[in-house]
Amino acid sequence: KPSPDRFYGLM
């Protein structure tokens, strides 16, 4: 599953 950390990396 995708990690929230990767999502924040886009920010």
Curated annotation (Swiss-Prot):
Residues bearing PTM Methionine amide: M11
InterPro entries (UniProt xref): Tachy_Neuro_lke_CS, Tachykinin_dom
Superkingdom, natural source: Eukaryota
Location relative to the cell: Secreted
A GO biological-process term: tachykinin receptor signaling pathway
Similarity section: Belongs to the tachykinin family.
Protein known as: Ranatachykinin-A
